[in-house]
Amino acid sequence: MLGTGTPRLNPDRSGPSTAIVVGDRAYLIDFGPGVVRRAAAAARKGFPALEPPKISVAFLTHLHSDHTAGYPDLILSPWVFGREKLDVYGPEGTEEMTQHLLMAYRRDIEIRTNGMEKKPPLVVHAHDVRPGVVYKDDRVTVKAFAVPHGEWPQAFGYRFETPDRVIVISGDTSPSDELVANCQPCDVLIHEVQLPSYNVETMPDWPAYRARYHTTTDQLAELANRAKPGLLVGYHNGGTEEALRDILQQIQRTYRGRVVVARDLDVF
């Protein structure tokens, strides 16, 4: 779990980003603020596949800024230190965002390739994808499925099938029957979760917003009882340690399976 936070400016919780590591390869999902340095930290903790120049395949669940603000860093920094190419898969708009970022950093890229550094060309292949199998290699098969996230016309969850595990990641979503179907079966479900009281003081319309965009503790417990993952991992919450304990306790009121609430750099 590279980043488990929200748009809240919590220095202990980077923006949403998850890595699936299969042997010597890492597959990145979402690029919240701080993603590249969190990957470097994970590499130091025993996951060399997460050395940033080695990350070459990545996926976006949707294009909210808290999930994409680290994208320029992911494009540029690993390239500066030797990455050969990057393939990025995501909903409609991923290609457009990538093109605009490359244009925004055009002068930097030109100086690094044509100046004294003599960097090789920056190669980024962005792919707008639709639900279904979007990526496959000899380690993993990745399936995208649609999830409901407010006004976003496309938001995805992903199902990763590896030789020994099936991992499902929700992205941002309100409760989703499609997600439950994609957990049949799954070893690990990584799902966003929000306290019902989160943001109420500063955002009076939060309950209405949350109902369309996110999943509460009680809703996640109900969903997990249907999905039956081997392990449920809650993420994408920006609260204090007390809030994390509250989230766990509220889920456990009605869900008896294995469940944890993730912190940055946790490993499962």
Locate predicted features.
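Binuclear metal-dependent hydrolase catalytic cores
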Residues: M1-V168, D246-F268
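Cap/insert and terminal regions of metallo-dependent hydrolase folds
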Residues: G157, D164-V166, S174-D266
